[in-house]
Amino acid sequence: VIETLGVVLKKSAYQEDRVLLDLFTEQHGKIKVLARRSRKARYSDQIFELGHWQLKAGKVFYFAEDYDSVQHAFIKGLNVWSGYYLNELLMRLMSAHHPDAALFTHYWRALAALEHADAELQEWMLRAFEKALLETLGAMPDLTTDSDGDEIEANLNYYVGIEAGLSKHPFKMSTPVMP
């Protein structure tokens, strides 16, 4: 039996009495879990809920043996869309069984920030998660120099281009592109 912290990213009906969960875990990365669906089920298939999972490894996916809720991110209103955005990033970009405890921590902190009304904190945590994900994937651009080879200057604004990388922003902006 494998024990791990995990958050449900997505749930899909599998059979009448079972559900297939895409779970993002601290020790095993993104995995698929088959869980029984019943009134007495000891697991939660609610997204944005951190839980302590006991799993049994199978050939294709894991089987949920036991579950204890640890904490739920009570995300309301339009912030739910930001939570779905985080889940979609993980679903589409992370390969299965790619553990990264630091990324898991960034993910959970970003979800927790979405509970609060502080838009600045939410933006900061979303960007921190995106940066951590890019680093995990090996796709983070160099942020020490710009596309011209010049060192980054604190008083200038920059943007990230697909081909060029980090470039000086041609216009003066009232708010920085990267805080």
Where are these regions (language model features)?
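Non-catalytic alpha-helical scaffolds and adjoining flexible linkers that form interface surfaces
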Residues: 1-18, 24-179
